[in-house]
Amino acid sequence: MNKKLEALFRENVKGKVALITGASSGIGLTIAKRIAAAGAHVLLVARTQETLEEVKAAIEQQGGQASIFPCDLTDMNAIDQLSQQIMASVDHVDFLINNAGRSIRRAVHESFDRFHDFERTMQLNYFGAVRLVLNLLPHMIKRKNGQIINISSIGVLANATRFSAYVASKAALDAFSRCLSAEVLKHKISITSIYMPLVRTPMIAPTKIYKYVPTLSPEEAADLIVYAIVKRPKRIATHLGRLASITYAIAPDINNILMSIGFNLFPSSTAALGEQEKLNLLQRAYARLFPGEHW
């Protein structure tokens, strides 16, 4: 992160209020600390109160300001109560960062009797995020100011195999946000989607092969959010994400072939790799050819 961008970031967030979901670990934890260190009041949302209290204590130890709001973001009534608690605690929210998410790595042919995978992924990644937006948006409209940042996925651009439930939920939020963006433009509210590549967080830990593929660190992912806050673009993607989007737009069959090769190259479970759970040379080469992609 260059010094000029960092200075602009501090200028943009100092004295502001930022609500971050999924703030107890990974990207959410990292960006919460970063925003608090820049002088904002961070509102931390996640399921577990004890973990949130630890994050709050760490932020306050560094001189930052944080408030915690434990909430199950798959429960719509709980989100309504959360929203009421937040607006009773602070009079506005300047930044809403929809970071909380659930990912499922499972091929469609392995999901014939697992419709609940699609339901629970949509419940958190789409319905939970939309419910929170609908609750907070009237206050942003009234103030004619605000930014909503959605942590999406490179899989939305590349059509990642084995992630149909996850990608569909992120794509739904993406489509909702594109429609909303035009509606709130006159109210000076901006909406940014960040198509994150794989990030080394607890969410990807169960997939052991991801130990051996290129990923971003949570700090690098936080840099993208910092850029989003400063520049307020409609979308942010890596070079691979943009290339995947262009390829699918002008040559969808090529995109299909490349994703199919990856689908057949990588196993559905680490058990198929044996006890060492390592990638062979061909798998490593393909993973490096498409850095940050979900396989």
Curated annotation (Swiss-Prot):
Name of the protein in question: Fatty acyl-CoA reductase
UniProtKB keywords: Lipid metabolism, NADP, Oxidoreductase
SUPFAM superfamilies on file: NAD(P)-binding Rossmann-fold domains
Active-site residue list: Y166 (proton acceptor)
Entry keyword annotation includes Oxidoreductase: yes
Recorded superkingdom: Bacteria
CDD domains found in the cross-reference section: SDR_c (cd05233)
Enzyme class: oxidoreductase
